């Protein structure tokens, strides 16, 4: 069954696995996610579950949003997100999803908006190499070089150039959940995830093929300190 939840990125830290290897992890506070709507094939043409995350005052919503929450007797939520599922049985409006929906050893896909870097050159944005710094060249060391050939006599579309970097919605697939603190609603996810600290993350069971041999995870007694 597909698992999903919405969380907030706290930051990164390090933990030791059962073999004593140091492992970088991202601390994610997944909070109390409430089912705000259930989509069915008969009514909507597809199956999905909508979750709400984070509190917000009524003045931060438009009229249609406020009426939606009042009609369903729900508290106002800052973030709403639909997750496609094959079967909606077991989900109902008001149902709460917490960190204990996952367990250590699960693989997840994490989606979020990346950090905005502003206008960036090709070296930072596309990992280009620098130009030679010898033979009198002093003002083009970070240039991309020629942007077109003599034959077409024009710049072709799709070339890698400087421009706005970051602030894009991306998904990182097949990340390992190292530990779950159900009491504090915290997940430890191996490696880095997109988004700045305190950014919203959308977490769901991975669509990638799961390896047969899982890596060793953190001891169950490991305590997680929240900032």
From Swiss-Prot:
SUPFAM superfamilies: Translation proteins. PROSITE patterns: RIBOSOMAL_L3 (PS00474). GO terms for molecular function: rRNA binding; structural constituent of ribosome. Keywords: Ribonucleoprotein, Ribosomal protein, RNA-binding, rRNA-binding. One of its GO terms (cellular component) is cytosolic large ribosomal subunit. GO terms for biological process: translation. Gene3D superfamilies: 3.30.160.810, Translation factors. One of the primary rRNA binding proteins, it binds directly near the 3'-end of the 23S rRNA, where it nucleates assembly of the 50S subunit. This is Large ribosomal subunit protein uL3. It comes from Endomicrobium trichonymphae. The lineage of its organism: Bacteria, Pseudomonadati, Elusimicrobiota, Endomicrobiia, Endomicrobiales.
């Amino acid at each position: 069954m597909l698992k999903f939840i919405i969380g907030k990125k706290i930051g990164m830290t390090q933990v030791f696995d059962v073999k004593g290897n140091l492992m970088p992890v991202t601390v994610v506070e997944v909070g109390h996610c409430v089912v705000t709507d259930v989509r069915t094939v008969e009514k909507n043409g597809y199956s999905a579950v909508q979750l709400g995350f984070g509190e917000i005052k009524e003045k931060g919503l438009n009229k249609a949003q406020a009426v939606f929450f009042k009609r369903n007797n729900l508290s106002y939520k800052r973030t709403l997100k639909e997750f496609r599922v094959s079967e909606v049985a077991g989900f109902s409006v008001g149902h709460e999803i917490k960190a204990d929906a996952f367990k250590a050893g699960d693989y997840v896909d994490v989606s979020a908006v990346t950090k905005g870097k502003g206008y960036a050159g090709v070296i930072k944005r596309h990992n280009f190499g620098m130009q030679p710094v010898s033979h009198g060249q002093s003002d083009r060391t970070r240039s991309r070089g020629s942007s077109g050939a003599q034959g077409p006599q024009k710049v072709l579309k799709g070339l890698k150039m400087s421009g706005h970097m970051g602030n894009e919605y991306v998904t990182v697939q097949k990340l390992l959940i190292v530990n779950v603190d159900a009491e504090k609603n915290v997940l430890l996810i191996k490696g880095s995830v997109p988004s700045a600290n305190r950014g919203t993350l959308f977490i769901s069971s991975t669509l990638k093929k799961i390896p047969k041999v899982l890596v060793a995870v953190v001891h169950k007694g490991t305590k997680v300190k929240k900032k």
